A protein has these predicted regions:
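A non-transmembrane, solvent-exposed segment enriched in polar/low-complexity residues
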Residues: 1-105
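Extended amphipathic alpha-helical segments with heptad-repeat/coiled-coil character used for oligomerization
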Residues: 110-164
Length: 164
């Protein structure tokens, strides 16, 4: 643990990662930052803080995004999807209410929300018991392909930008 003061010049907004914290820094930002191992406990104040306070709750794709490493898994895909969609709608609403961020930031984060939804749907197969009882590689492959095809109607609008 320690403290430091640094200044650097940015030509354009960009994301940075420090430990599990994702920062969004833009030219002209002037913040006091407390970085922690637990990203949700990080602290930001000053110019640029609003975007970074929002970023504290960024999901982790390797943990299945909205599935939160299986913690948000429900009894079946339909129930899990309903929860994922609800959590994404809340995240989208939170993003929409930010007032001191650029339209470019909102566009990037809207894309991240969509990507997290898609990732959550796809990761359901890995976190659920969908493959329980499957005995052969062929059977598993067939079940996996069937699941992927079933996702098409839910995922396609997200790729096309039709998510509200």
């Amino acid at each position: 643990a320690g403290y430091f003061d640094t200044t650097f010049v940015l030509k354009e907004p960009t994301y940075y990662t420090i430990s599990r914290n994702t920062l969004y820094l833009t030219p002209g930002d002037d913040m006091t930052i407390k970085v922690t191992q637990t990203n949700t406990e990080a602290e930001f104040s000053g110019i640029g803080a609003e975007a970074n306070n929002y970023m504290k709750f960024r999901l982790f794709p390797k943990g299945g995004s909205y599935l939160e490493a299986g913690g948000n898994l429900r009894g079946d895909f339909v129930s899990t999807k309903a929860l994922v969609d609800s959590l994404a709608a809340i995240r989208m609403h939170t993003l929409d209410t930010l007032s001191n961020v650029s339209d470019a930031f909102k566009k990037l984060e809207t894309a991240r929300i969509k990507a997290d939804i898609i990732n959550s749907y796809i990761c359901y197969a890995s976190y659920s018991r969908m493959f329980a009882g499957v005995k052969t590689e062929e059977e598993m492959r067939a079940k996996w392909n069937e699941f992927n095809v079933s996702l098409t109607q839910d995922v396609t609008p997200l790729y096309k930008g039709d998510y509200e």
